[in-house]
């Protein structure tokens, strides 16, 4: 048994010693079978939430009404959830009521996809009543039971299905795919925040291109923020190598760039994204407008925009044009390393120095002089030392020698 499960084994053993059933469930078991990195370990048990909290000294009630308690074991937090069933769903997104049960089978039966409905006991034996292992072996995503019923319970499951395509490279079971096509409109009931979370995971996956194509094919894109009129652009976006975009800002920036979005800020706000990310994307897009070609970078421009923003913009441009991303990043890094100063903070003089030397009160002129000095330092006209800069200003007849 792999280490992440070993660390949590004490929880299962404690529950079993007190007469309860307990199993590892969900994504961790799936990822074990896929030989992927194992994330959070989740445990399902026949013990009720109150019973779980009585057994363990350190617990956090994060939703006992829905059956979930966090147990802190050896300094690590684990979600322990009581076996449960769910009644009719409300608004295509949440169950009207949760009923605690003592049956693992009933608990697994309520889950979304067969690959996520596998349990593992303390000895490593798998309990797989719905064919999850077979689905994994065949690289197929299919629902537990009737896909139309699963998607009408929680419409976000349709996005999750395609997100898993993006992450795992699996194919959609034909019945599952057809149910998404027929029920795509239900996605309109889902909050933007939940859709954004799934969409970001989709874009981050190694098979994002395949997933984007499926968003169009199934019609789900029609119910995603500001994508209704972007069918052709999305199909084009699916042809690019998204693996080369290695940050959140680069992925959203590339999407705006390829979709020809008029206002990136409006588009990203529609997805309820944070202001910091919006500013990051806007900067990358501004660079692409300001610097027409990757060969147009100068020391001054790179100092102005900064290496991180420059690399983001050039990555977007390179992926869009099919050019060598690493080559452009390397050139930018080399140019940046050649800069005598990398940021404004590294300049040897301050605004106070300038006001003292010029014998004048502050104003916009101070920033103009500092910018002039920055350019001179960057281009090697003067060393970045306070005395040298002062002499340079005198030599340029900008200040009188006696003002020092």
Swiss-Prot record:
Q: What is its EC number?
A: 2.7.7.72
Q: Which UniProt keywords apply?
A: ATP-binding, Magnesium, Metal-binding, Nucleotide-binding, Nucleotidyltransferase, RNA repair, RNA-binding, Transferase, tRNA processing
Query: Any keyword Nucleotide-binding?
Result: yes
Q: Which cofactor does it need?
A: Mg(2+)
- A GO molecular function for this record? CCA tRNA nucleotidyltransferase activity
Q: Which residues bind ATP?
A: 27, 30, 111, 154, 157, 160, 163
User: In the UniProt record, does the keyword Transferase occur?
Assistant: yes
- Write down the chemical reaction(s) this protein catalyses: a tRNA precursor + 2 CTP + ATP = a tRNA with a 3' CCA end + 3 diphosphate; a tRNA with a 3' CCA end + 2 CTP + ATP = a tRNA with a 3' CCACCA end + 3 diphosphate
Q: Which biological processes are named by the entry's GO terms?
A: RNA repair; tRNA 3'-terminal CCA addition
Q: Which family does it belong to?
A: Belongs to the tRNA nucleotidyltransferase/poly(A) polymerase family. Bacterial CCA-adding enzyme type 3 subfamily.
Q: What else is known?
A: A single active site specifically recognizes both ATP and CTP and is responsible for their addition.
HAMAP family, per this entry?
CCA_bact_type3
Job of this protein: Catalyzes the addition and repair of the essential 3'-terminal CCA sequence in tRNAs without using a nucleic acid template. Adds these three nucleotides in the order of C, C, and A to the tRNA nucleotide-73, using CTP and ATP as substrates and producing inorganic pyrophosphate. tRNA 3'-terminal CCA addition is required both for tRNA processing and repair. Also involved in tRNA surveillance by mediating tandem CCA addition to generate a CCACCA at the 3' terminus of unstable tRNAs. While stable tRNAs receive only 3'-terminal CCA, unstable tRNAs are marked with CCACCA and rapidly degraded.
Specify the protein name.
Answer: CCA-adding enzyme
Q: Which organism is it from?
A: Geobacillus sp. (strain WCH70)
Q: Which gene specifies this protein's sequence?
A: cca
């Amino acid at each position: 048994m792999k280490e992440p499960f070993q660390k949590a084994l004490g929880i299962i053993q404690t529950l079993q010693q007190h007469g309860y059933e307990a199993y590892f469930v969900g994504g961790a078991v799936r990822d074990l079978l896929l030989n992927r990195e194992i994330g959070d370990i989740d445990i399902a048990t026949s013990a009720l939430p109150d019973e779980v909290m009585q057994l363990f000294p350190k617990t956090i009630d994060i939703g006992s009404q829905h059956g979930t308690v966090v147990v802190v074991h050896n300094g690590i937090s684990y979600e322990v959830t009581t076996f449960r069933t769910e009644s009719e769903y409300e608004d295509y997104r949440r169950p009207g009521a949760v009923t605690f049960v003592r049956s693992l089978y009933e608990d697994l039966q309520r889950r979304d996809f067969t690959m996520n409905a596998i349990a593992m006991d303390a000895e490593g034996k798998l309990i797989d009543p719905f064919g999850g292992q077979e689905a994994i072996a065949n690289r197929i995503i299919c629902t537990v039971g009737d896909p139309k019923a699963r998607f009408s319970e929680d419409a976000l499951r349709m996005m999750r299905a395609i997100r898993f395509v993006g992450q795992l490279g699996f194919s959609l079971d034909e019945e599952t795919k057809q149910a998404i096509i027929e029920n795509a409109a239900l996605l309109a009931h889902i909050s933007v925040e939940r859709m954004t979370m799934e969409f970001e995971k989709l874009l981050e996956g190694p098979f994002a291109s395949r997933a984007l194509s499926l968003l169009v094919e199934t019609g789900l894109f029609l119910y995603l923020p500001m994508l209704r009129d972007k069918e052709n652009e999305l199909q084009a976006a699916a042809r690019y190598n998204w693996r080369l975009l290695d940050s959140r800002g680069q992925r959203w920036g590339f999407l705006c760039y390829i979709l020809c979005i008029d206002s990136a800020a409006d588009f990203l706000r529609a997805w309820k994204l944070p202001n910091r990310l919006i500013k990051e994307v806007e900067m990358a897009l501004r660079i692409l407008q300001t610097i027409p070609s990757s060969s147009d970078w100068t020391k001054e421009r790179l100092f102005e925009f900064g290496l991180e923003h420059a690399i983001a913009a050039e990555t977007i441009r390179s992926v869009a044009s099919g050019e060598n991303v690493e080559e452009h990043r390397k050139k930018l890094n080399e140019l940046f390393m050649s800069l005598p100063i990398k940021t404004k903070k590294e300049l040897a003089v301050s605004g106070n120095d300038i006001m003292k030397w010029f014998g004048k009160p502050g104003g916009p002129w101070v920033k103009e002089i500092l910018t002039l000095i920055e350019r001179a330092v960057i281009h090697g006209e003067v060393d970045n030392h306070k005395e040298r800069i002062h002499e340079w200003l005198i030599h340029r007849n900008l200040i009188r020698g006696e003002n020092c």
